[in-house]
Amino acid sequence: MAAKDVKFSRDARERMLRGVNILADAVKVTLGPKGRNVVIDKSFGAPRITKDGVTVAKEIELEDKFENMGAQMVREVASKTNDIAGDGTTTATVLAQSIVQEGHKAVAAGMNPMDLKRGIDLAVSDVVWTLIKNATKIKTSEEVAQVGTIAGNGDESVGKMIAEAMQKVGNEGVITVEEAKTAETELEVVEGMQFDRGYLSPYFVTNADKMVADLEDAYILLHEKKLSNLQAMLPVLEAVVQTSKPLLIISEDVEGEALATLVVNKLRGGLKIAAVKAPGFGDRRKAMLEDIAILTGGQVISEDLGIKLENVGLDMLGRAKKVSISKENTTIVDGAGKKEEIQGRVAQIKQQIEETTSDYDKEKLQERLAKLAGGVAVIRVGGATEVEVKEKKDRVDDALNATRAAVEEGIVPGGGVALLRASLSINAVGANSDQTAGISIVRRALQAPARQIAANAGAEASIVAGKILENKGATFGFNAQTGEYGDMIAMGIVDPVKVVRTALQDAASVAGLLVTTEAMIAEAPKKESAGGGGMPGGMGGGGMGGMGGMDF
């Protein structure tokens, strides 16, 4: 086992504070509309330019083990805030740095670290309650756009695009952000349910120019096993032909005689038909077939339920206004499912999302939820260079997460004003002077984000903070973009309460642990063994001299 290096009390805390400061100073320059960029060297490819706090934090690794421990603890603050709220990582880092710095001074002055932490926790729960109480619910699309614009660093086009996407797919809908192949940023909305399976044979195509199969007012047969025997399918095919409506078959696979017969009938014009494989695998496939059944008002034909294909009538088939099938995707628009059944299924999936612990399962369940609840929107981020696209994609991701958080819990005035105001309404009372000192530490820390935003904009931080606190208006603040004071909500500068709350809670949690640290243990640096370095003695200067006259 390697030898360990142990540091105690003041020495340990000072090293750790140095690490906290290095990381926080690199992250906090990105805060606010006038925040600066950070350039990150990559081992391959072009350097990355970003204004995303958590991306900067994740890149920092310090040489000194003790300083690195401090930096990594604060990095954890940014990551945690990012995981829960998706934005506010820089605010969380600034708050954590302030609490650690003030806490370090208090401990050095002889205060009890445990009581300081209790005071910090009391103040934080008080502030969180105030924030939630003062939050305003989002009602209009304009408010959604405002949140997106602020989180996207003042880029109005980003805010508008996110608001438009949310309007089209609903708050539950899936909105994904991808890199575009062009210079333009665009929004594409897929309404209805789309899954990534295309037609089984190109002969099913109805539009040869676009190579898609479009079925209007179609019946949908959902079968969970393979279809290879034509005989079993005949009754249902004959019933559909009588109605002269098209038919879409979704099953594990259609092969052999069954597929050949369907293709021949399609080509002869007797039957408008298309077949696709069912989406997903295993249990997920069953669940997705059930989703499609509920959406279209049909039934999954399954041996487990004792339903044989021979006995299937038209009433067991789903219906949809339009089905569009390309080589890779199938989209079902306007299914005939009952609204209450779809809502019941949505509630069931939401319950599963809350219960699952796996991120992968959660993501897949959310995709299913979106397909049932309204559709999928894709924002394709474009730019002139790859570096620009990556930087903009970071901002769009942040803006999207912030907007979701705002819809969920409401909004408060932005620009650090909500925290600054909350510092005035902390009513918590400490049980002793050390706890009261902990409460004061939080009160001072709550000014840090507003001060940093002002400093990044080139304003005098203490004057800005003083001016905001002097004014009694709850939404009065400093617009760093224009350098004006005024009503933050009227100016459209708002923050999601979830982002502000999470940033403070995570910052205080980790900062409290750092303040109460008394010893630190790290692996001791290995001493170089004597005489190990350098070349063996006799190989000095011209050891290879005799090769001069060789002819090549």
Swiss-Prot record:
CDD domains: GroEL (cd03344)
Name by which UniProt lists this protein: Chaperonin GroEL 3
Cellular localisation: Cytoplasm
Subunit structure: Forms a cylinder of 14 subunits composed of two heptameric rings stacked back-to-back. Interacts with the co-chaperonin GroES.
PROSITE patterns: CHAPERONINS_CPN60
Described purpose of this protein according to its UniProt entry: Together with its co-chaperonin GroES, plays an essential role in assisting protein folding. The GroEL-GroES system forms a nano-cage that allows encapsulation of the non-native substrate proteins and provides a physical environment optimized to promote and accelerate protein folding.
Pfam families (alphabetical): Cpn60_TCP1
GO cellular component entries: cytoplasm
Protein residues bound to ATP: T30, L31, G32, P33, K51, D87, G88, T89, T90, T91, G415, D495
EC nos: 5.6.1.7
GO MF, one example: unfolded protein binding
Annotated GO biological process: protein refolding
Keywords of this entry: ATP-binding, Chaperone, Cytoplasm, Isomerase, Nucleotide-binding
Catalytic reaction list: ATP + H2O + a folded polypeptide = ADP + phosphate + an unfolded polypeptide
Alphabetical list of PANTHER family matching this protein: 60 KDA HEAT SHOCK PROTEIN, MITOCHONDRIAL
Keyword match Ligase: no
Main location: cytoplasm
Source organism per UniProt: Mesorhizobium japonicum (strain LMG 29417 / CECT 9101 / MAFF 303099)
InterPro entries, A to Z: Chaperonin_Cpn60_CS, Cpn60/GroEL, Cpn60/GroEL/TCP-1, GroEL-like_apical_dom_sf, GROEL-like_equatorial_sf, TCP-1-like_intermed_sf
Family: Belongs to the chaperonin (HSP60) family.
Gene encoding the protein: groEL3
